[in-house]
From Swiss-Prot:
GTP binds at residues 17-24, 81-85, 135-138. This is Elongation factor G. The gene is fusA. The keyword Chloroplast does not apply. Keywords: Cytoplasm, Elongation factor, GTP-binding, Nucleotide-binding, Protein biosynthesis. Belongs to the TRAFAC class translation factor GTPase superfamily. Classic translation factor GTPase family. EF-G/EF-2 subfamily.
Amino acid sequence: MAREFSLEKTRNIGIMAHVDAGKTTTTERILYYTGKIHKIGETHEGASQMDWMEQEQERGITITSAATTAQWNNHRVNIIDTPGHVDFTIEVQRSLRVLDGAVTVLDSQSGVEPQTETVWRQATEYGVPRIVFANKMDKIGADFLYSVSTLHDRLQANAHPIQLPIGSEDDFRGIIDLIKMKAEIYTNDLGTDILEEDIPAEYLDQAQEYREKLIEAVAETDEELMMKYLEGEEITNEELKAGIRKATINVEFFPVLCGSAFKNKGVQLMLDAVIDYLPSPLDIPAIKGINPDTDAEEIRPASDEEPFAALAFKIMTDPFVGRLTFFRVYSGVLQSGSYVLNTSKGKRERIGRILQMHANSRQEIDTVYSGDIAAAVGLKDTTTGDSLTDEKAKIILESINVPEPVIQLMVEPKSKADQDKMGIALQKLAEEDPTFRVETNVETGETVISGMGELHLDVLVDRMRREFKVEANVGAPQVSYRETFRASTQARGFFKRQSGGKGQFGDVWIEFTPNEEGKGFEFENAIVGGVVPREFIPAVEKGLVESMANGVLAGYPMVDVKAKLYDGSYHDVDSSETAFKIAASLSLKEAAKSAQPAILEPMMLVTITVPEENLGDVMGHVTARRGRVDGMEAHGNSQIVRAYVPLAEMFGYATVLRSASQGRGTFMMVFDHYEDVPKSVQEEIIKKNKGED
């Protein structure tokens, strides 16, 4: 089957936003106007095409990123709809990793909200070009220019309108195109009849002012345009569009559009902007990776002629076809029935069938080409972030960063029959979602699940019940603490046992130093002269990793520590891997006496919105919860307070805020970083954990 759309005519985009900005409705309208669906599904009625899981339709939020393919103006647009709720951050991260561009949807009344900041920061990390769609222009309190100002103030983004709204709230009736300098007036409810007219006289001055600002902002990113602009020459519409495209693709400029997806206004113009300003796979730098045989860096340009290379970015269990692996093809061509090499795992995989996805319906295809996003059936060993490549041209692409879980719950099956089913269900859910961890407490035999927030675990327990028919009792949420060292030290681990026959002997000297935050555990072998034989070095590292999993203070995993093995000794007969593993763990225990071990707790960035008169209460809440205020701003009659507060202090806060503000206050929290707990709290945690032992 020949390629239907050239690479130049392919767009891989994500739709990202804060929860409730109207992102899923926007995607629905895109599917409607591109001819994928013939009746529009409203999210608040629970009928949305992209939100196909039962929980999504009940809760009206998007949990998994559904991928779909649509066509617009002779282009193929692959769309990934991502969740806006902070508990599902990994879904956003893995989507951004495989996208070339994104549409950031804002609620025009609120502008940039906490989760918008999170997804924006993630998109910046991955270098993803973006356009901004200020949605809900029909909503009471909608304010387009306020939304634009929040892009500058809260995100420091070089964002400028390429459109202006005509009217707002109930009176929102059209859009001014600042490039063509024409007005697009909507004359029917479905948004399919659009009249192009001259700009109404009362909007002309504003339109000219913002066109001038737009030209100036774009000219600043392009020397040739800047020269023309300074010399007073006219910049043509074509030059302006080309300048916007170039600056957007270079992530130097963010065009801002407006509309109301719910009222069917502005979505087609936004689709035009996706084609005009977001990159094709050819416009972005070629993907880099490491050749596992030579350790050399290699690139894979976007081309069907190059060897096949793809990244698996999502695993899903489908009730009809079983395990689905979503992947993005960066180079080459793949046919169903062929074999690929999973270079991350070193395993050969057979591609059974290839499916092009549309939310939860699917179309079987024979071939995928570079730049495509598709799903494969039949992969057994592949997990999120794995590289799939041609067996003769190996490459390991950069994987997906997985954030550490911050909250945990104990789950126990209600009956013996549920016991076996629960193990299978949890394993399948963990395969789909790398931020969901399942562990068994060795001493008590309890199953502990960890995730990114209460809603995250709630949804997973719910899925366990519905999809796998497992009934379970769930404990109260607990905070996922971590441990680390705050000082450097050197410590010996010496293990010797002699009891008839072959003995055990292991002797190591290890230097422990604090590592940078987020860098995890790093092991360095600095042995010279073979005082610890090479075959025992991995055992030393393994012994440390296993011991660090249970910490040195209160049984929590240790993070951000460097360990340098620099000396030791061995016995020709009695030394073994086991002996060196034990010696390494004894060295860690010894180090704990002088390395100032500390317990770390997750700190949340909490954004609280309350009426002016409740500001004092909120400041009191933050202080009482060991928090610190980071900033405040007024928005209408409300105050928005941003603060860093330990997660441990936030359980039950929704009820406290509700009663303090008579139900008018709201808050959002997102994990920000780990921080040392105060000494008094640390002692309490240690006592509590020792008591449980």
